[in-house]
């Protein structure tokens, strides 16, 4: 789109539709396009008659927030446009909402959650917003007996699905043994199933061992164990709780994005307006365990 001329966009939509025959074409406004006010939604409305693919416009490309707000808007856009009505709900099926691939190693977390829910509750995943899923799975989101929200950005989407399909949601992230036990209890209550007793016993045994870890933190020296956690809001909260249960003091809970999209952020979670601010904190640490992404770790002192 140049100087308001959308001819190239119109031609691109027709060419994509004929060449690839996609089920859906997403039209995303860039920051410049959003700022100058190009009517992307209007273009999609009148071009819908010219193509077979369903056109979905995303016009939130401005500068009003960071990527966490963009994620929340994207999840809402998808659940408002893709899930089909009339899909029968099935027992033992769930959707995951808020699994952003921007989050550090989220694919590993999703794999672990799917394995855990299968073993403990006999549940199967339908769709995962937005990590390794398909249009067909998103269309069938109404099948789910429960929606599992792994990130604050997915809450609005889960609430919309609850209104549209009557599907309850559980907002919990299973970090640490205590967090995992709580997660299983909440999901089990939502689907009317009791978690497998052997899985619970295994987790409870490990939880007790972790609780005793704090007794050994003073052995050998008198230095208190310290840590810093940096990442997305829910990851920081979950991992910090796990460390504190083991007797490790978390000095800084550093959120990698702004807290604008968080309704009631915890008072001890820090968001930094400038990159230099959190870099100064990281570079000044000594004798401290740092849990963060590769970029942050490379900035830390070797000690």
Predicted feature locations:
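An N-terminal assembly and electron-transfer interface module characteristic of large anaerobic redox
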Residues: 1-303
């Amino acid at each position: 789109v140049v100087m308001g001329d959308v001819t190239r966009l119109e031609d691109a939509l027709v060419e994509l539709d004929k060449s690839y025959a996609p089920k859906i074409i997403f039209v995303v406004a860039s920051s410049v396009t959003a700022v100058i006010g190009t009517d992307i939604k209007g273009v999609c409305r009148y071009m819908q008659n010219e193509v077979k693919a369903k056109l979905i416009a995303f016009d939130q490309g401005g500068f009003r927030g960071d990527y966490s707000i963009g994620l929340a808007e994207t999840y809402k856009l998808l659940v408002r446009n893709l899930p089909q009505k009339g899909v029968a709900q099935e027992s033992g099926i769930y959707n995951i909402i808020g699994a952003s691939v921007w989050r550090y190693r989220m694919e590993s977390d999703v794999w672990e959650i799917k394995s855990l829910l299968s073993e403990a509750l006999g549940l199967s995943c339908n769709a995962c917003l937005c990590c390794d899923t398909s249009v067909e799975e998103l269309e069938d989101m109404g099948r789910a007996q429960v929606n599992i929200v792994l990130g604050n950005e997915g809450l609005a989407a889960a609430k919309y699905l609850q209104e549209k399909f009557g599907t309850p949601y559980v907002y919990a992230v299973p970090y640490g043994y205590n967090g995992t036990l709580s997660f299983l209890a909440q999901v089990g209550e939502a689907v009317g199933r009791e978690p497998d007793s052997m899985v619970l016993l295994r987790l409870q045994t490990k939880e007790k061992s972790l609780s005793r870890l704090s007794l050994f933190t003073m052995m050998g020296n008198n230095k208190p164990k310290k840590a810093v956690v940096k990442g997305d809001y829910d990851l920081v909260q979950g991992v910090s709780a796990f460390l504190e249960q083991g007797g490790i003091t978390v000095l800084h809970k550093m959120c990698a994005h702004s807290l604008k999209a968080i309704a009631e952020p915890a008072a001890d979670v820090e968001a930094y307006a400038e990159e230099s601010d959190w870099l100064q904190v990281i570079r000044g640490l000594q004798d401290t365990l740092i849990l963060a992404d590769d970029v942050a770790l490379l900035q830390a002192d070797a000690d």
